[in-house]
């Protein structure tokens, strides 16, 4: 039996319960069918139905928000060591079920096994990291003045809403939920409707680890129903959202009446800039990895290659050769590098850019084709002879599609890099240190890597500028969102108090 066949057999064992019972909401430690009916979730591999999923509505969100509100005082006041122990047990539970999580995620999203097996473990790492931060989360400062001893402390903001996307959904859910729980908040989680499976597994793991009922509630469904109700609910004090920029704008409007605090990790049209003095072998590997891994369906993908004109032809020639060798196939095959796109709607969007590129005058140097008709597979694609005014250089395609644009000077490279509505990440390849310092200072991006692909370090800030988001995740920055700063001043003596009415 091949590795693919073994993975399919294991997957079928894990899917049996979903096919039998569907996926229900999980509110206050109990299953709820809800009042919004059901929808079907499909696998992008072969367009088959995986199972039925409860479709959340405003009533379901109200139940979940009230459960989170009721559970908040006890969770907030639980000793930090106890909360830490529970988060560590959640991490251990994720590790124990990592294979199940990865298999389900591959089938649910089309992501390749080679990446999802690592993403599941990364989810456990997120919980372990924030478990270690629990005891210091409330730490503040001592600020002495002439008449007062001033101290600051942090307290959890309250029940929060977490809305997560369909790309690497399990890992990104842990990335948002772990710090919220570590801070002492309770959570209502609304996962993407296109990838509901592993959100159910996560809440099961959390409850088995001892998380009290109501601390983490999961309501499945669509943004226009469950998502909108969550962002508008008065008991929810903050919304953490990962997804499209236009949706982030809608959430801002929906949460305005309740003065909702928001954190957005949104879209990107990220540049990778390669100068003539770079280590071109390593740069080539990084360029390919950062757009074609994870199906190109990630916010930090470097979808614009800015290449110095003196090395353009040689670099693009090698790039075309490598792109044409990328293995597209079944996501559960360990040899597969790119699987199918997430859904019919997204497939139609990504493939529409094949004609858009041609009509705008770009050349399809690699790919630009659909593969088969049993799933949402496309060939990894490279556009050349492009300029930054083209739609393929300005719009987030969110697939395995790279646009190559030449530049003649450092100033021109900087102008092109910044000429986009987005500002999430940028990648710079040069061996000139002074150029790197100069260039990174002027790049309009929240995160920049020099001579490296995206290598995340959990304590560092993660987030973008412009249309790519608001706020930062990671390390103490996560607590700045999920907690409120509180100032207390203690008089150190009988200082003068102004007297009125005497």
Give residue spans per PLM region.
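Short gly/ser/thr-rich secondary-structure transition/capping motifs
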Residues: 24, 30, 139-147, 220-221, ...
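Residue-level signal for inorganic ion chemistry
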Residues: 47, 83, 105, 127, ...
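Rossmann-like NAD(P) dinucleotide-binding subdomain of oxidoreductase/dehydrogenase enzymes
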Residues: 139-282, 407
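Short, well-ordered beta-strand elements within core beta-sheets of diverse protein domains
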Residues: 50-56, 71-77, 162, 272-275, ...
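Hydrophobic face of amphipathic alpha-helices that form TPR/SEL1-like repeat modules
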Residues: 1-45
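ALDH superfamily catalytic-core signature
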Residues: 238, 246-387, 411, 450, ...
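Conserved C-terminal structural/oligomerization subdomain of aldehyde/semialdehyde dehydrogenase
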Residues: 48-51, 236, 273, 327, ...
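Glycine-rich loop-to-alpha-helix module at the N-terminal edge of alpha/beta enzyme cores
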Residues: 47-137, 147
């Amino acid at each position: 039996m091949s590795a693919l066949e073994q993975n399919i057999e294991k997957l079928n064992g894990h899917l049996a319960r979903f096919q039998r019972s569907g996926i229900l909401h999980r509110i206050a430690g109990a299953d709820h069918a809800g009042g919004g009916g059901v929808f079907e979730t499909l696998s992008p591999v072969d367009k088959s139905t995986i199972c039925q999923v409860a479709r959340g509505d405003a009533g379901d969100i109200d139940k979940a928000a009230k459960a989170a509100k009721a559970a908040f005082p006890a969770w907030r006041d639980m000793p930090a060591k106890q909360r830490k122990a529970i988060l560590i047990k959640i991490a251990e539970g994720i590790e124990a079920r990592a294979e199940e999580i990865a298999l389900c995620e591959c089938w649910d999203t089309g992501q390749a096994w080679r990446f999802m097996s690592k993403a599941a473990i990364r989810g456990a790492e997120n919980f372990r990291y924030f478990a270690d931060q629990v005891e210091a989360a409330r730490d503040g400062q001592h600020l002495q003045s002439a008449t007062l001893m001033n101290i600051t402390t942090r307290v959890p903001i309250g029940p929060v809403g977490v809305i997560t996307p369909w790309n690497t959904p399990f890992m990104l859910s842990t990335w948002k939920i772990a710090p919220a729980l570590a801070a002492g908040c309770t959570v209502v989680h609304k996962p993407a409707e296109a990838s509901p499976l592993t959100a159910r597994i996560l809440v099961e793991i959390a409850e088995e680890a001892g998380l009290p009922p109501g601390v983490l509630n999961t309501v499945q469904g669509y943004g226009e129903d469950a998502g909108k109700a969550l962002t508008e609910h008065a008991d929810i004090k903050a919304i953490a959202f990962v997804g499209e920029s236009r949706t982030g704008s809608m959430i801002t409007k929906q949460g305005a009446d309740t003065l909702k605090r928001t954190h957005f990790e949104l879209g990107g049209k990220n540049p990778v800039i390669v100068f003539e003095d770079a280590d071109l072998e390593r740069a080539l590997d990084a360029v390919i990895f950062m757009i074609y891994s994870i199906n190109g369906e990630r916010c930090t993908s470097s979808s614009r290659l800015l290449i110095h004109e003196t090395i353009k032809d040689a670099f693009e020639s090698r790039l075309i050769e490598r792109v044409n060798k990328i293995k597209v196939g079944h996501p559960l095959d360990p040899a597969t590098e790119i699987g199918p796109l997430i859904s019919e709607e997204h497939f139609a969007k990504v493939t529409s850019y094949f004609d858009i590129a041609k009509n705008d005058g770009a050349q399809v140097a690699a790919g630009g084709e659909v593969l088969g008709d049993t799933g949402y597979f496309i060939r990894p694609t490279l556009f050349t002879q492009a300029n930054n005014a083209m739609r393929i250089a300005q719009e987030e395609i969110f697939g395995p599609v790279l646009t190559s644009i030449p530049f003649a000077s450092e100033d021109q490279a900087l102008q092109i890099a910044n000429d986009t509505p987005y500002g999430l990440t940028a990648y710079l390849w040069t061996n000139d240190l002074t150029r790197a310092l100069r260039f990174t200072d002027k790049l309009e991006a929240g995160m920049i890597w020099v001579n490296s692909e995206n290598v995340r370090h959990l304590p560092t800030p993660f987030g973008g500028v412009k249309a790519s988001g608001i706020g930062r995740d990671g390390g103490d920055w996560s607590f700045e969102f999920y907690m409120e700063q509180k100032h207390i001043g203690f008089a150190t003596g009988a200082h003068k108090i102004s007297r009125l009415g005497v």
